[in-house]
UniProtKB/Swiss-Prot annotation:
Keywords: Autocatalytic cleavage, DNA damage, DNA repair, DNA replication, DNA-binding, Hydrolase, Repressor, SOS response, Transcription, Transcription regulation. It comes from Alkaliphilus oremlandii (strain OhILAs). GO terms for biological process: DNA repair; DNA replication; negative regulation of DNA-templated transcription; proteolysis; SOS response. This is LexA repressor. The record marks 95-96 as: Cleavage. Belongs to the peptidase S24 family. It holds the Pfam family Peptidase_S24. Residues 29-49 bind DNA. It catalyses: Hydrolysis of Ala-|-Gly bond in repressor LexA. One of its GO terms (molecular function) is serine-type endopeptidase activity. HAMAP family: LexA. It comes from the Bacteria. Its EC number is 3.4.21.88.
Length: 206
């Protein structure tokens, strides 16, 4: 399910689900524009048309906010499961490319709306043991809220040499320290770093 959606369409669909659940009615096209970072309402209309063509929503052309969320999953009824949203699992992160580019999304995973709160959220599969003392183990999945800034002590996803890494963030006098949570590993010291987001959750298969 959702394999036929690109990243922006999935983002719009999840945003509409959240707003309908929170307010009881769908957002306006202008609100969708602002929420997902698009400048043109015509671009949003194009994405909504695609979502309707693919059977995810139904619109009433005579009413500007009349959008009904449909479900094409036979095991799921959105009307009885309004608290869940599909969060994209990102397979890779590349410099200069949007995180939620279609080719980066490997799958989606349902998470409770109140768990992810607001903002764009994605999931990464962690490789390695650099964060084991923070309870993040090899092959865990971390839930990340997209943001470009961080506070000292935040666990972040940073982009280094075109690879995403999960570390604890510290801004110091003349550099940034990305600190592993593994006493056997050394910190990474950088003049500057690209922050992709803050880790807000972790889950694993037992």
């Amino acid at each position: 399910m959702y394999e036929d959606l690109n990243g922006k369409q999935l983002e719009i669909l999840n945003y509409m689900k959240m707003e309908i659940n929170k307010r009881g009615y769908p957002p306006s096209v202008r609100e969708i524009c602002e929420a997902v970072g698009l400048r043109s309402t015509s671009t949003v209309h194009g994405h909504l048309a695609k979502l309707e063509d693919k059977g995810y929503i139904r619109r009433d052309p005579t009413k500007p906010r009349a959008i009904e969320i449909l479900s094409n999953d036979p095991f799921s009824d959105y009307s009885h499961n309004k608290e869940m949203v599909q969060v994209p699992i990102v397979g890779k992160v590349t410099a200069g490319q949007p995180i939620l580019a279609t080719e980066n999304i490997e799958d989606t995973f349902p998470l409770p709306l109140n768990f992810i709160d607001h903002g764009n959220t994605f999931i990464l599969n962690v490789k390695g043991e650099s964060m084991i003392e923070a309870g993040i183990l090899d092959n865990d999945y971390v839930v990340i809220r997209q943001q470009s800034t961080a506070s000292n002590g935040d666990i972040v996803v940073a982009l280094i040499d075109d690879e995403a890494t999960v570390k604890r963030f510290f801004k110091e006098s003349d550099h940034i320290r990305l600190q592993p949570e593994n006493s056997l590993m050394d910190p990474i010291l950088l003049k500057d770093v690209v922050i992709l987001g803050k880790v807000i959750g972790v889950f694993r298969k037992l």
